[in-house]
């Protein structure tokens, strides 16, 4: 059974047609372009699409059943999605890397103190920021309800996916200055 699109991750958008053979511009919204390979299938707002050709140098993609310019035009502005299992299978991580969906929902601790819970991750320029919903006990003392912490070694000590805890240092200073 196919998952609803809202349970999947938006990974790319299809642009205009290029040439006469059904090539389309590919606009990536993922950190893992290597997941796009001939034969891989992805969900879209137009149903399942299977890659028949991909050219990263030109930034183009072609799908099975859409090998003419007229057929391919129907896919302009189509969004491509991958589910969690597909993402984990096709996107190998290096040591110390984590998928955003594994970090969102983690508690954020500085030493023994609970600062809050990661409710989103935002990318500003080339840096990922943990958007943290501040713990109620800290909000009650007059601190902000939300704050951002750069996901860099300066602030993040480690992320324990099994325990769902992000250990940080100096993040409370950011919270207090927010």
UniProtKB/Swiss-Prot annotation:
Annotated Pfam families: PRC_RimM, RimM
GO MF, one annotated term: ribosome binding
GO BP annotation list: ribosomal small subunit biogenesis; rRNA processing
Main location: cytoplasm
GO cellular component: cytoplasm; ribosome
Keywords: Chaperone, Cytoplasm, Ribosome biogenesis, rRNA processing
Subcellular location: Cytoplasm
Keyword Hydrolase recorded: no
Ranges for domain PRC barrel: 95-174
InterPro entries: PRC_barrel-like_sf, PRC_RimM, RimM, RimM_N, RimM_N_sf, Transl_B-barrel_sf
Superkingdom of source: Bacteria
Keyword rRNA processing (UniProt): yes
Function: An accessory protein needed during the final step in the assembly of 30S ribosomal subunit, possibly for assembly of the head region. Essential for efficient processing of 16S rRNA. May be needed both before and after RbfA during the maturation of 16S rRNA. It has affinity for free ribosomal 30S subunits but not for 70S ribosomes.
Family: Belongs to the RimM family.
Matching PANTHER family: RIBOSOME MATURATION FACTOR RIMM (PTHR33692:SF1)
UniProt note: domains: The PRC barrel domain binds ribosomal protein uS19.
Oligomeric form and interacting partners: Binds ribosomal protein uS19.
Name of the protein described by the UniProt record: Ribosome maturation factor RimM
The encoding gene: rimM
